[in-house]
Amino acid sequence: YGCCGWAPDDAWLHSAGASLWVDGAHISTISEERLTREKYDGNFPDLSIDYVLDEAEITRDEVDLVVYVESIHSTPRHDAIETVLSREFPDAKISFCDHHQAHACATFYTSPFEKASILSFDGAGNSFPNNTYETGLYAIGDKQKGIYVVYHSINGAKEHSTFNLGQAYNNISRWCYSKMEPKKAATIINPYIFMETAPGKIMGLSAYGNKDKVDLPDLFKINNDKFYFPYIYDHRMPTEPQMDKYDPKDIAAWLQDQFETILVKFFSTITIKAPNLCLGGGCGLNVLANAAIIKAGLFKDIHIFPAANDSGLCFGGAIYEVSQKEKKMAMPECLGFLGKSYSDEEIENALQ
């Protein structure tokens, strides 16, 4: 099984990579950026594919199944991707896996839990022709029965605009960064790649601020077991003039507190829940929020896949198919090191 991430001529795609599995066993996974040295490289992962195939000493002609993380619903881009992948892997079946399904599979199946609640959430997932896109997924995972999706959030339709904490964090992080580093913000070449990096910086900045200095309405609401960021509909998103009254570090502290508070409230009130929790998606890398969930004592244990952001999609997409087709899966022993091993001699030669 192979999985790669990329889309033709799409500047909004990033973090391409490839993951190879053989007979239910993980062989190797790598991000294209590790080989091209271009941060968040979203081009077709030629080097990643060659890297993982070389480890198993097989060719592209020998790959049986290729999984691509993209909406399972057909779109013009979907068809273009399938055409290219069929050309690159002539004897392989081409399959698709939804963005947040891939995140969910990556974090749940690498966890030690037989059953767990799963939350995957980030800025955005798959986009659809009607200008809507995924923002999150809440599910219950069972290693014997699979993953049961409780809520799958589609942003842009009011009744489904839930789990979009990542969008809020991205938007306000962008404002904070533009105030702290105006020259850098003005020269951003790819705004989406910028959005990948800004939230982590603002999470760090929050430690220097004071949330109590900010007097703004709460960002999020909870309704029927779902949290959402309703600024699109009732203008709860603070305007720039409103935020301009405050120091960016205080806005960062307020934003982080809002983020943590709504997560703890959600897990406190959710009616469908398992004893343990798995987090995926870029928001799963918010260590302060994760600590707040742990401190609240709402779960026995929590697991976060190290590559919770989109660099782990190729890994999760492959697991999506492997979990359905193989009776047993052999996970890598160390989730922080998914590439191939190197001998002492190879390391010495590289250093020389």
Residue ranges of predicted features:
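Short acidic/glycine-rich loops and adjacent helix/strand connectors
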Residues: Y1-Q352
